[in-house]
């Protein structure tokens, strides 16, 4: 077996931080552009606590090998049309929030990859994610940018396909169908070529997994780090899924660990 395949590689795949959102991930006591300090809500404290827990799990899993961090899109919330659920509309400040959250993990990572998210959040041609990637010295795309619309990567002999966008799966009765469909589409798209064994998408804030439904590939829709927005309450009764994915690659095989943290449902009102 080639020496490259003998090396252990651990990936931490995170997405949809939506830094700058009042229901997104944020470090405690963040200083706003005008000098004030933003204090976390109870829900954001819960998010931050679990974010640190996920990072600790990933770093522990990576001991004795390489550690790669992959951000699969929507690092910041941006200035979304008609939304008032932002800590600040300053894109500089939102990027600083994302940078502060990522920095401890990037410092421990051997490589950092930035996948481009939704332009409504991260700017035209994902300019803010490109900027964050450049600031951290993230791995470059074949065109020389510090972020990728799509990343096709061989890690330890396992072929991965990363991109941000995917559709469907928002209703309970269709949950998981988007992952199975994505896996099947991947097999057809790569017909006659090497087929990615693991495919990752994000965007919908609902975890889904094709598991073994499609023999040649497995598709995973990642959980997010933003709780339900006003828009989320309008389109779905259940909370967003929160968490990330840790993949350990050894001897050309990948072991997938999906780490989920369960948000509380809306509290039941009781007659007093």
Regions found by a protein language model. Name each.
Residues 251-272:
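A short C-terminal boundary segment appended to hydrolase-like catalytic domains
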Residues 159-161, 166-258:
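Conserved beta-sheet core of the metallophosphoesterase superfamily
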Residues 14-18, 73-76, 117-120, 165-167, ...:
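Active-site metal-binding loops of divalent metal-dependent hydrolases
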Residues 57-67, 100-113, 193-195, 250-252:
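A structural motif corresponding to the C-terminal end of an alpha-helix
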Residues 11-13, 69-71, 114, 161, ...:
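Residue-level marker for buried hydrophobic side chains located in beta-strands
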Residues 48, 76-144:
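Active-site neighborhood of divalent metal-dependent phosphoester bond hydrolases
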Residues 3-12, 152-161, 214-217:
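Beta-strand-turn-beta hairpins that frame and shape the catalytic cleft
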Residues 1-93:
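N-terminal active-site segment of His-dependent metallophosphoesterases
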């Amino acid at each position: 077996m080639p020496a490259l395949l003998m090396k252990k590689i651990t990936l931490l795949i995170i997405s949809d931080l939506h830094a700058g959102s009042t229901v997104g991930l944020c470090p405690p006591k963040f200083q706003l552009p005008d000098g004030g300090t933003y204090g976390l809500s109870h829900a954001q404290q819960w998010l931050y606590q679990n974010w640190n827990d996920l990072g600790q799990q990933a770093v522990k899993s990576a001991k004795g090998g390489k550690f790669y961090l992959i951000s699969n899109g929507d690092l910041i919330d941006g200035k979304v049309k008609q939304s008032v659920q932002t800590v600040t509309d300053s894109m500089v400040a939102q990027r600083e929030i994302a940078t502060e959250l990522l920095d401890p993990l990037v410092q421990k990572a051997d490589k950092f990859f930035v996948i481009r998210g939704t332009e409504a959040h991260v700017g035209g041609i994902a300019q803010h994610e490109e900027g964050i990637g450049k600031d951290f010295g993230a791995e470059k795309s074949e065109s020389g940018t510090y972020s990728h619309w799509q990343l096709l990567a061989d890690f330890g002999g396992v072929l991965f396909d990363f991109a941000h966008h995917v559709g469907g799966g928002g209703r309970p009765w269709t949950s998981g169908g988007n992952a199975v469909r994505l896996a099947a589409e991947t097999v057809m798209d790569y017909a006659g070529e090497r087929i990615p064994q693991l495919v990752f998408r994000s965007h919908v804030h609902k975890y889904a997994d094709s598991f073994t439904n499609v023999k040649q590939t497995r598709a995973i829709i990642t959980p997010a780090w933003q709780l339900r927005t006003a828009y989320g309450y309008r389109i779905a009764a259940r909370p967003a899924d929160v968490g990330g994915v840790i993949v350990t690659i050894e001897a050309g095989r990948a072991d997938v660990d999906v780490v989920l943290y369960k948000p509380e449902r809306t509290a039941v009102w009781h007659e007093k």
